[in-house]
Regions:
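Intrinsically disordered, low-complexity terminal regions
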Residues: 1-185
């Protein structure tokens, strides 16, 4: 189906077992995509994007709202505004962040998460991992809190903090059983 409508109207998209293509859209949008791929342009007023059991998803830009991605492979080329994200059992997830972001909160489980951060981003990072670790491939400096070299036995929980630029944008990540990589490209 091809649907033509004004791009500033509210839109709710629900699709199972099919491909969905949404071009740049300036109205409030909710997307629920299952068992098919999602390709989207710049989504200016996101209420919620939910993707489940899908591979090869590409979203050019998400501005605000909530991302909920499960059992999928997805790339988001730009996050803007205040975004809350929930990721579970994904086979690969890449998020690109820069100074268009105002706040990012991520809860991640069983997903290898790649954060591609612009070198000039002004962010303060707070990262907690459980049965996983932070792989810092960026030029930013991260410090592991409570890193006691004299401690005996395994350590399953890790707390990291880091800052780039003035640290204006809060980025909070909680990850269980999923490595978090922060890098540039």
């Amino acid at each position: 189906y091809i649907i033509y409508m004004p791009s500033q109207n509210q839109l709710n998209v629900a699709n199972e077992f099919g491909k969905t293509f949404v071009p740049d859209y300036s109205g409030e949008i909710t997307i629920n995509q299952k068992f098919g791929t999602l390709t989207a342009g710049k989504l200016s007023k996101v209420k919620k994007v939910h993707i489940e059991f899908s591979a090869g998803n590409i979203i050019e830009s998400v501005s605000g709202g909530e991302l909920d991605i499960r059992f999928s492979r997805t790339q988001v080329n730009r996050l803007e505004g205040k975004v809350k994200a929930f990721f579970e059992h994904n086979s690969g997830l890449k998020l690109v962040i820069d100074n268009a972001l105002t706040e990012l909160t991520i809860k991640n489980s069983f997903t290898q998460l790649l954060i591609d951060a612009n070198k000039n981003i002004s962010a303060s990072f707070t990262i907690h991992t459980n049965f996983s670790e932070l792989d810092n491939k960026s030029s930013f400096s991260f410090k592991e809190e409570g890193n006691d070299e004299d401690r005996r036995g395994p350590k399953f929980d890790h707390d990291y903090s880091g800052k780039s630029g003035a640290g204006n944008i809060p980025v909070k990540i909680k990850s269980e059983f999923g490595e978090v990589t922060i890098g540039h490209n």
